[in-house]
Structures are given as C-alpha cells and as structure tokens.
C-alpha cells in the first residue's frame, strides 16, 4: 500500500503529519509526479485548514466539498503542466535554472519591483542544494501542492480599468491571463465592466451634470456653488433634468470599450517585446494609443453628451434632434470641437493613474501578499479611488478647456476660440483657480462611482459565469 504523507510546518508548533489518502497502487506514468513527503512552507499557508481548502477548491470537480484520489491525481497532472509553463516563462536564459535576476526581471515585466535581497529570499525558500538557483525539480516540489500561480493571480485580482468607472474612460486597459483569453472569460469581464459603468454613471449623473455646468458657466462674476447649482437645475427643469446627458454618456460605453480593447491588443503587438505581459512603459504607450483610437472613433458622442447636459428645457427633443441641429448649424467640424485638448489629456490621465495604481499595488504585494495576491475589497477600492483621483487632478485643466470648446455654440454669441487662446483667457480673467472649476463635484462622485461600479461588476460576473473573488 502506498501512502502519501504531507508534512505541514506550522509556525510555533511541532511539525504535524497529515495522512491525505491511501492507495494500493499508483499508475507508472504518475510516479514522477509524487514525492512520498511534501513540505509546504509555513509562510505560504499558516494553517492546515487554509491549505486544504485551497487544494479542495482547485481540484473538486464534482463539487461535493471533498477530494477523492482520482480528483487529486487530475489536479496534480493539470497543476504540473501550469507550473512547467510558468517555469519556462521565468527561465529567461533557457538554461533550465532560475536565478535572482530572472525573478526580478519577470516581476518587473509585470510592474512589480523587488530588490535583489527580496529575490534571493524567494530563491532560498525553494533552493534545496544551496546553489542560489532553482531547477525544475525544486520548482515543482515547492509549488506542486500550492494551488495558485502567483503571476497570473496578480493579473486576475488587480484588474483596474475594467472594474472602476468614474466617467472618464481614459485609463490603460487591463491585462488578461492566458486562461481568461482562451476560455473566453475576457469578454465576460468587459460586459460586466460595461454594465457596471452604466449603473455607476447613471447613479452619479447629477454630479456629472453639475460639473459640466460649473466648467462652462461658473466664473468670478457667476460664482456657482454645489447647492446653488443643484437648486438652479431643479428650478429650471425639475428633478428629471439632473440626468440630462446621461443617456448618451451610457450609450458610448459599449463602442468605446470594444474599440479600445481591440486597439489595445493590436498596439501590444506593435510596441511589446516577446514577453507575454507588457512592461509598464509598454502598457502606457499601447494603452494611450488605444485610448486615442477609441476616443477618435466616438468623439462626436462626447460633444453630444456635453450639449445635451447643457441644454435648456425644450431645446432638443432628443439625441438625434441635437445631432441634426448641430450638423445643420455648425457642420461636421463641430463634432470634433475640443478634440486636441481631449487627446492631450490622455497621457497625463492614463500615465498618472497607471503609475499611482501600480505603485500602490506593488507596495501592498511586497508588504502584505503572503497567502494570496487577492487584496480584498477595501484595498482594491482604495487603490482605484486614489489613482483615479490623481489622474483626474493632473488632466483636469485640459478636460475643462475641452468642455468649454465643446459647448461654444450652446452659449449664444460665444466667439470661436482655440485651445491656447482659451487657456490664456481663463488665466487672465480667473487665474489658475479657473482651470479647476467644477472640481469639487467631480471628486465627490469618485468614491460612489468606484464603489457602485465594483459592486455591480462583481454581481454581473457571477451572472455571466465568471468566478467571483
């Protein structure tokens, strides 16, 4: 009888032995998979129960809450294949061994920066013979009964632009794991993200419309506060007027997200290296180019959104009527007013948002990622809120100028202006503060927008058959 024994060291306790299962025979082709004793490092799983739960979740095919011999063997076979792929991706020199520099480079490619000392610490935990390199056998023995591959897990749990929608779709698109792309889960994530964005934008639409009104109409002579702005909107058009412009704002989510995703996949091939996952600067370049392509494609909808938000009661019967009147009165060029400041705003927004998010992600991973790369709800929401706020703060003057240019014809008698002349005019008449009109309601909507989009995203994932966190 062959008995597989698992020794699980628990910090502060004597080494405990657990007999997992017994079998009278083991197929010859599977003998290479097993070791009679497997040691699971205490820093990976602090308790046997936590370790067992992860193994059972990964291998339980019939969902009976238990792992029989056949399921366990299938889990080991499948997991070893995944480990082989990860090992090959880490082995940059193709010499059959992984050293500290290769670990640092692989994590750097994912945007996770660690020191050489940290890389050596990782090596020592797996290195059995003291060579400070890891061969395939050492890698397999260490990770075989660890149900998570850390590199894809980081991509899986730390999605950003797919989850969070604050109304400005200028963020760098998320990466998807190989498994997500092969199984078609990527489009489910995008659909869930689109639905979450629609609900989030609808819930925060009153604040978004107030922001647009303050960007266009507020000045030193017309000091518009938040309460006064809401009162003015309700007095002019009733409570329903708070949602003016929301229809087109929601409608543009689907085409923009689809174009952006497809463009990003193409840009990755142009700017990327041979690595499966892009480096941070490559992601920024590919994401910014994809964002520019998507924005160029749907920009007329951006102009319509601004005009619809600024309209007075009875001015337009709907979106199509608004578009027809703009076309008849101002021509096709009117649908691209503010295009240049909008394009220029992509780099600071996407760059700072990505940089801040990656910095916060790396800090958390280095300090707290022991058992899993899953940061939990509150950490993810906090990182998303902070990075989005920083990105908006950096690009806000350009966004304000874009909105004023889009709104030119909606203000009767307003002269035709360029981006540079509008900047000069604002600085001359209102000072630097004038470039940040409407910032308060814009920031007020970030936390509810992020929270609502996250909750809706998680629920839509379950509905669409995507495993929740």
Swiss-Prot record:
Mainly present in the liver and the skeletal muscle (at protein level). Residues 151-160 are annotated as: Linker region. InterPro entries: EF-hand-dom_pair, EF_hand_dom, GDC-like, Mit_carrier, Mitochondrial_sb/sol_carrier, Mt_carrier_dom_sf. Activated by an increase in cytosolic calcium levels that induce a conformational change of the N-terminal regulatory domain, uncapping the channel and allowing transport. Solcar repeats lie at residues 184-270, 278-363, 375-463. Induction: Up-regulated in dexamethasone-treated cells before the expression of albumin. Signal peptide: none annotated. One of its GO terms (biological process) is response to food. This is Mitochondrial adenyl nucleotide antiporter SLC25A25. It comes from Rattus norvegicus (Rat). The lineage of its organism: Eukaryota, Metazoa, Chordata, Craniata, Vertebrata.
């Amino acid at each position: 009888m062959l008995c597989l024994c698992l020794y699980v060291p628990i910090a502060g306790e004597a080494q405990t032995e657990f007999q997992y299962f017994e079998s009278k025979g083991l197929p010859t082709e599977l003998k290479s998979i097993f070791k009679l004793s497997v040691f699971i490092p205490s820093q990976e799983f602090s308790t046997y129960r936590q370790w067992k739960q992860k193994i059972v979740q990964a291998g339980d095919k019939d969902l009976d809450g238990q792992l029989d011999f056949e399921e366990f063997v299938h889990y080991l076979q499948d997991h070893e294949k995944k480990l082989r792929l990860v090992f090959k991706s880490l082995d940059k020199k193709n010499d059959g061994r992984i050293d500290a520099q290769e670990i640092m480079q692989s994590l750097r490619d994912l945007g996770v920066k660690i020191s050489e000392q940290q890389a050596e610490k990782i090596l020592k935990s797996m290195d059995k013979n003291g060579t400070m390199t890891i061969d395939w056998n050492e890698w397999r023995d260490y990770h075989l009964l660890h149900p998570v591959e850390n590199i894809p897990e980081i991509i899986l749990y730390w999605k950003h632009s797919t989850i969070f929608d604050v109304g400005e779709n200028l963020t760098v698109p998320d990466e998807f794991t190989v498994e997500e792309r092969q199984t078609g889960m990527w489009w489910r994530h995008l659909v869930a993200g689109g639905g979450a964005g629609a609900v989030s934008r609808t819930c925060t639409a009153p604040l978004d419309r107030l922001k647009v009104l303050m960007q266009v109409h507020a000045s030193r002579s017309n000091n518009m506060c938040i309460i006064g702005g809401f009162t003015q909107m309700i007095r002019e058009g009733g409570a329903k007027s708070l949602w003016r412009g929301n229809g087109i704002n929601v409608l543009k989510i689907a085409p923009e997200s689809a174009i952006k995703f497809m463009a990003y996949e193409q840009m990755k091939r142009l700017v990327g290296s041979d690595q499966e996952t892009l480096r941070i600067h490559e992601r920024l370049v590919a994401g910014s180019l994809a964002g520019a392509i998507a924005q160029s494609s749907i920009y007329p909808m951006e102009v319509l959104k601004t005009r619809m938000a600024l309209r007075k009661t009875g001015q337009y019967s709907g979106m199509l009527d608004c578009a027809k009147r703009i076309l008849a009165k101002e021509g096709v060029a009117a649908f691209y007013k503010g295009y240049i400041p909008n394009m220029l705003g992509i780099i600071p927004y996407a760059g700072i948002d990505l940089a801040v998010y990656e910095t916060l992600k790396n800090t958390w991973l280095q300090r707290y990622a022991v058992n899993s790369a899953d940061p939990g709800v509150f950490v993810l929401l906090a990182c998303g809120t902070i990075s989005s706020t920083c990105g908006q703060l950096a690009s806000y003057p350009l966004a304000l100028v874009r909105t004023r240019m889009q709104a030119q014809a909606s203000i009767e008698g307003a002269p035709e202006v360029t981006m540079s002349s509008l900047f000069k005019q604002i600085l001359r008449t209102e000072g630097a503060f004038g470039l940040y009109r409407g910032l308060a309601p814009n920031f007020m909507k970030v936390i509810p927008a992020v929270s609502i989009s996250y909750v809706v995203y998680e629920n839509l994932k379950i509905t669409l058959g995507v495993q929740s966190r």
